[in-house]
Amino acid sequence: VQRFLLYAAERLHSAGYYLSGDVFGECANPYVTACGQYWPAISAAVDAISGMPYPDHYSAQGDYKPWEHPYDTVHMFGAAAAARQAETASPAAVRTWIQAYNAIREPYNTYGAEEVAAEVRALRDTGCSGGFMTWNGGSDINKYQSIISALS
């Protein structure tokens, strides 16, 4: 993955473009994932790295359901991402994807402005200040209108 990103960055930079890389939220953890995404290597190769720590994508641990704790879940990601950035010689900006859709698992809780604001606050509290992007695969304009207050 890194070799391709270095090649792509060289080509894109010479044409005046930037390169970003999206990675699973899990990749911020201090181990090498089976998916071939190694945070420090990708962060060193791109201009912006975008983790995807959607709370509903994390596994339940006993009674703990990450999708019911958006602040805590994204805070854990942000702290891990900050640690990985610190070990990267020339890290990219961290621009994180956040969940802006209703949880897809039982109890199918609704993600509204409060949950999105919690995710944004968690990123800021951990120093992930390179911005964020909202993921709403259904591109539901009503959802965006309902969370707009959380995006400032």
Annotate each language-model stretch with its function.
Residues 3-10, 14, 37, 41-44, ...:
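Alpha-helical scaffolding segments of alpha/beta enzyme cores, especially the outer helices
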Residues 1-34, 89-103, 135:
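Aromatic-lined carbohydrate-recognition surfaces of secreted/lumenal glycan-active proteins
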Residues 1, 63-70:
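Glycine-rich tight-turn/loop motif centered on a GG-T
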Residues 31-33, 61-63, 107:
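Short, well-ordered secondary-structure micro-motifs
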